[in-house]
Amino acid sequence: MTDETTKNGPDATAADAAADAAANVEIDNSVQEEAKQPDPLELLKAENAELRDRYLRLAAEMDNLRRRTEREVKDAKSYSVAGFARDMLAVSDNLRRALDAISPEAKATADAGLTTLIEGVEMTERSMLSALERHGVRKLEPVGQKFDPNFHQAMFEVPNSEVPNNTVVQVVQAGFTIGERVLRPAMVGVAKGGPKPVEAEINSVFDEKDA
């Protein structure tokens, strides 16, 4: 028995060494696998950063949507009557033409009936323009201003050496704005033959009306 044990001793030692080596390799592999796996805390941090970024983007989109909606609602309130206002301006134009068709002499010598009719038409015109103004429609007053193609439509030139070139000197048809938009440009006559306009900062039509 002793001889057999002695005889098998080296083989047993080699087997044990191989087993230990295999175990060590397995442990090393296990350690390496654990090392390759990401840290749960780092994963949570990355996930938190991603969620925060998504939240900020969503908040920005919601804020932009809110602003855009507010602007669209404001525009809808301001400009929803634009089509109706244009139709009413056509009626107002007809009232003005009717009044302008009556000569000063006819007005001066008019009987009570004609005088009452004229006053009624004038009152109707004023009431209509006042109603439009309450809805944001304002009349342009371009006489004396420098011609501005954004608000005026030049119909003819008037020789005039007393005022700078391109000064509005006559209004053929009144112009109107609604909010910050031109509802209808004023049809005007502009001066020609005068001195060149002085280069200076000119307030916009809206600024002058608001002053």
From Swiss-Prot:
Main localization, broad class: cytoplasm
Transmembrane stretches, start-end: none
Database matches in PROSITE patterns: GRPE
Cross-referenced PANTHER family: GRPE PROTEIN (PTHR21237), GRPE PROTEIN HOMOLOG, MITOCHONDRIAL (PTHR21237:SF23)
Keywords (A to Z) from UniProt: Chaperone, Cytoplasm, Stress response
Residue ranges that the Swiss-Prot or TrEMBL entry lists as coiled coil: none
Taxonomic superkingdom: Bacteria
Protein name: Protein GrpE
Xref: CDD domains: GrpE
Region feature (Disordered): 1-43
GO molecular function: adenyl-nucleotide exchange factor activity; protein homodimerization activity; protein-folding chaperone binding; unfolded protein binding
CC annotations in GO: cytoplasm
Pfam families, per the entry: GrpE (PF01025)
Positions with biased composition (Basic and acidic residues): 33-43
SUPFAM superfamilies: Coiled-coil domain of nucleotide exchange factor GrpE, Head domain of nucleotide exchange factor GrpE
Compartments (UniProt record): Cytoplasm
